[in-house]
């Protein structure tokens, strides 16, 4: 297969939300146009593949990065040839369908260097959305009087992403105690995670998986998180991180790390 675009949408400054959806559709169409060449099509996002799967005998496997329960039920009813996979037990429970197999996400351990000599700062990595808990991480870091590095992309054509950043995050960035980097290559992100004393993850939603959590743990960085979504499946409390119920508990734990 070949890309239908010369550059990834997220790296194209001229890209818009509507162009991204157009190119996503174009890419999926180009794939299914050649479906008979393959034994299996594996889709990592569920919005388009189920519809195209109805026009081929080649089976489609869809890994649910995230999906609403109502949408899953619609796919089950109308596209039985499309086989879903959940990324955590928590996600399967949220969908209310015990028949879905669970296959956890993985990472390339060769890309991540373990570091047992951290520097004096904490980190949070994630999209600039309220659900990731970045504003809460800032508040926790300030209460604990520790330095925090934020790495997270602002999606400028989505008002709620840019608005969240401008209102809840940007006013706190001082370049010293609270630092912010919008974009970094993957290797540099995991390097920064490995240097951090801890990874703060006060989620405000039920995260189906959370790749950054296992990336941080692989780098030797303990994760301090709320026990929401898949976090209890990924983190062994007291061994690979800490599952806590409040900001005050997180502040207290930070003092011990």
Where on the chain are the PLM-derived regions?
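Catalytic cores of nucleotide-sugar-dependent glycosyltransferases that transfer UDP/GDP/TDP-activated
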Residues: 1-257
């Amino acid at each position: 297969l070949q890309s239908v675009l010369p550059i990834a949408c997220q790296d194209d400054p001229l890209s818009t939300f509507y162009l991204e959806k157009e190119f996503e559709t174009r890419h999926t169409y180009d794939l299914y146009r050649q479906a008979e060449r393959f034994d299996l099509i594996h889709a990592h996002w569920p919005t388009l593949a189920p519809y195209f799967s109805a026009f081929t005998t080649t089976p489609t496997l869809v890994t649910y990065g995230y999906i609403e329960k109502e949408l899953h039920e619609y796919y089950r009813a109308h596209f039985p040839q499309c086989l879903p996979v959940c990324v955590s037990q928590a996600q399967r429970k949220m969908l209310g369908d015990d028949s879905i197999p669970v296959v956890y996400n993985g990472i390339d351990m060769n890309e991540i260097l373990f570091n047992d000599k951290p520097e004096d700062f904490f980190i949070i990595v994630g999209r600039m959305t309220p659900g990731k808990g970045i504003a809460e991480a800032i508040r926790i870091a300030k209460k604990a009087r520790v330095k925090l590095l934020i790495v997270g992309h602002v999606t400028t054509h989505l008002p709620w992403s840019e608005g969240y950043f401008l209102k809840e995050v940007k006013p706190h960035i001082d370049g010293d105690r609270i630092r912010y980097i919008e974009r970094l290559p993957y290797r540099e992100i995991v390097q920064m995670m490995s240097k951090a004393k801890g990874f703060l993850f006060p989620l405000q939603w039920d995260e189906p998986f959370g790749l950054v959590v296992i990336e941080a743990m692989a780098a030797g960085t303990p994760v301090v998180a709320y026990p929401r979504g898949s976090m209890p499946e990924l983190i062994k409390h007291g061994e690979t991180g800490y599952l806590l119920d409040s900001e005050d508990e997180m502040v207290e734990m930070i003092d011990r790390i």
